[in-house]
Amino acid sequence: SAAAGELTTVEAGKLTMATNATFPPYEMTTDAGEFEGIDIETAQAIADKLGLELQIDDMDFDAALLSVQQGKADIVMAGVTVTDERKAVMDFSDSYATGIQSIIVPEGSDIASPDDLAGKKIGTQRGTTGYIYCTDDFGEDAVVAYDSGLTAVQALNNGQVDAVVIDNAPAKEYVAANPGLKVLETSYAEEDYAIGMAKGSSLEDVVNAALEELKADGTLQSIV
């Protein structure tokens, strides 16, 4: 594996990861204020392979995507889906997990499939693929963007929106914590998660090599 001396990172000796730690089970904060989740463990394993200390910076999802573009973080991991728009402004590692966009509705809702979202108010998290897909499919007027998935779910509970479109993993957690809500069986979309980096980042090859090793030795499968 690459020696840390050869790697240029935002802060010498550290792998700085931008994330949005409101996204269980990929990243969340424990009651003690520590970060945990699939992305955190994967980033830690990569940092270990590269001989770097992992530094985690928590911020809004939008800001996390921008931070690598602005050279404030080395990588962004926040359940980030590879899209053509994002590829235009950043580079991505190989995929390390698959995500599903799901629809949360109240019990008894007449929304039973993605098509039923037409004419409804849809809550999403700003900057996410759920937001992008919904605005593409139903227009910006139909979609309300919130700072976090949690806020979107609160708006659904309060009747401000008719449904929330968000990744399946946090969707299940939010529904478990909010009686009266359910996740539709039909998914809205499927997508690949990857690690985002600045355009032309020198880390891309070593991060992919580390991911390859973590897949080969079973570490990644045990995390995801």
For each predicted feature, which ranges?
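Short loop->beta-strand "edge-of-pocket" segments that line small-molecule binding or catalytic clefts
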Residues: 15-19, 114-127, 142
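Ligand-binding clefts/hinges and TM-proximal coupling segments of bilobed small-molecule sensing domains
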Residues: 2-5, 129-146, 182-187, 209-224
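Extracytoplasmic small-molecule ligand-binding "clamshell" domains
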Residues: 4-79
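Acidic, polar ligand-binding/catalytic clefts
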Residues: 44, 53-116, 182
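Extended ligand-binding regions for polar small-molecule ligands
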Residues: 40-49, 121, 128, 194-224
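Short helix-initiation/N-cap motifs at beta->coil->alpha
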Residues: 40, 56-67, 109, 126-129, ...
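A ligand-binding cleft/hinge motif common to bilobed small-molecule-binding domains
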Residues: 80-88, 133-135, 157, 161-189
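Periplasmic-binding protein-like
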Residues: 21, 97-105, 168, 172-212
